[in-house]
């Protein structure tokens, strides 16, 4: 017979013991039968007796293993491993009478995990993997090697000697602890997970994850763990020898005081007394705990030691002495204060919060987690006092930290509420200020004594109402975070809250925080446009806004100044250009705040302006007029869509509307001239404005011609003015450029102004411009901007005597300019527009170097212009130089293969006539086949076939024949 998943009855006998029915018998009915069978087998087959292999029935070697064989193998294995964990298991099996007790012992768990691969049919332990991990965690505090009670002659678990963290449970007086009177067999009847024990301990947990039916009593999780690991042994204490009672008593005392012992190990931790209990209730609770310990000790047959109460008092005195040695900036607190009843909630004792506490809701699972301030700026690790408490609260063990990486753990959290919510900190006037504590979304202290009383807070009633809405945890990543040394001593920022920051802190932040951070707009003192509704903050601290940035939106601090338009995520909507200069936005606010212009009315104006701009962008918007933007013309002029709107209206509007718009534009004309969009509005006024308006704008140009000529957008306004205004006004304006002509010519913007002067004014009016070029023509001709100015002079001033000096300098440097990337354009311009004598002089300078210049990137263009604009005699000389004097000259073949000269050959084919063409065609026919193999030779072949198609075909046939 083989073992199956549910044990089967295999042997009967008179030694069967009737076990107490488990509370889970309805679900695991077949397991009770297995308990009886396994108990009989264990009593019939003691593993510590002599060799009894003959008592097991003989089986075939091919038959699967039986339960008897498994125990026999286990016995032999235990004999070979004396002193190991198997010895502990062997002694434990002697004293266990049921399978559940064996499978619940941690020693069996260790044996099961080490031998499951050898014997897959071993029944699994009743302790789930979650509870195994938790039991191991409870024993991690003891760094010494694991010891067992078996060394003293009694059986226990492998982890019984480790320090277990028990939870102190506070119960009403009329409640009786019935969990200790129940049989632990019901607990071992089924495997319980962490979630089951949490549901038993906290039946009102808000999370739906743990809403499962449970059958066990509502005992705290620490008691369940204690029942699994340690209390199971107390049921069989009567089996222990009398000599081992004292050691057991010592362990029991250590276990009962484990919570106090661990709490006292931290030199900076003390108990936080609950505000809901009186001193009398605390004394009765201590008395009940002492009697409970005495009852536990009396089970072993020993009298209750009188040292237990004294030891508890001694622990309390040690904790008080440790609290006196704490630094003054650390608030005495424990890690957790658990509310054991849905009707009671424990809060920290902080002055000035009694009235506020009356209005707070009674949270069933409410707990206060106080992040203790350690000297190194780190919070001590939380202890597993209650697993459900950490899962229902926002502990970093079970929830991600919604604060930024630079933020520490929140000071106070409530189960079921977002982290660092504004429920309590906003009214904790006695709590240390920001300089010594973690930054909170709201100020939890004040700099004046008037705010120490919650009744004096503006907008807040004495009962603590008008509590702000909670922050959405999933939106915290979009809020601005406070950046400050949260654990710095208070004296470091004892100056005015709006004073300068410590220079070392500024340097550190500048080197360790990215400047482009979307949540970090800058360092030092932040402007109110970057801060939310906050008051009396440390210098440079940025806060997490929960309300729109408006003075009317804060129910707590209605006088908090905030400028600009703040969206829900703290983004501001400000105009790119301001009307009143850099100092117009300064307002008078307490504490040195710089407010927005106009306060609330400015916000309305901004909303109206943005609504108009949105309508301009929309294709289906209503038709707007210039009168709709009255008073905002300048702001619309610097906007892309607003500038286009004004330009369109100025072309067809009435004189009255022009005058209205012009009255707003004229005071800011100088700034609009240099604006990327505003300059078009000025140009439109110069073009479509009245003569009086043009004259006013010209006066605005006077005195700043040089600066505007060198500016990207200002030079366009000047060019437009030179096109429209009369000659006298032009002459008056351009005289300001005298002495700065060459500077403007070499500038990427100013050269356009000089070109416009040459184009729009007679040569007699710009004599100072031409005079500035004397001796600089060759240099300016090789300049990227100067060559353009020289060409404009050749176009518009070639007939004047004053320009002869410029042409003479070009002819003298014709050969050099022909090889320059910019000068070749000047030479070509003279060949195209110059007089015949000027062209002849250039051709004479180039004769003898035509083949070499034809292979040059820039000079080849000049050679083409010479062939195109030369007379017949000059052209013949150039073609003869290209073709050579005899057929032995290979100039033509080399030019046809060259990447630049092939264009010169194509030009020769186009312009040659009569005898020269015949000679050229005959010489080119010889090389047509070879030219097809070259990239640039193909261009010659294609051009030749296009001009002389029939002759080329005949020549090819003759060559093949």
Swiss-Prot record:
Amino acid composition bias (Polar residues), ranges on this chain: 331-344
Modified residues (Phosphoserine): 193
Localization terms from the record: Cytoplasm
SMART domains: Pumilio
Record-level Gene Ontology MF annotations: mRNA binding; single-stranded RNA binding
Alphabetically ordered keywords of this record: Cytoplasm, Phosphoprotein, Repeat, RNA-binding, Translation regulation
All residue ranges annotated as the PUM-HD domain in the record: 608-948
GO cellular component, one term: cytosol
Positions of region (Disordered): 159-186, 283-344, 576-595
Single GO biological process annotation from the record: defense response to virus
Main location: cytoplasm
Pumilio repeat start-end pairs: 628-663, 664-699, 700-735, 736-771, 772-808, 809-844, 845-880, 881-922
Domain notes: The pumilio repeats mediate the association with RNA by packing together to form a right-handed superhelix that approximates a half donut. The number as well as the specific sequence of the repeats determine the specificity for target mRNAs.
Function: Sequence-specific RNA-binding protein that regulates translation and mRNA stability by binding the 3'-UTR of target mRNAs. Binds the APUM-binding elements (APBEs) in the 3'-UTR mRNA sequence of CLV1, PNH, WUS and FAS2.
Protein name per its UniProtKB record: Pumilio homolog 5
Organism lineage: Eukaryota, Viridiplantae, Streptophyta, Embryophyta, Tracheophyta
Underlying gene: APUM5
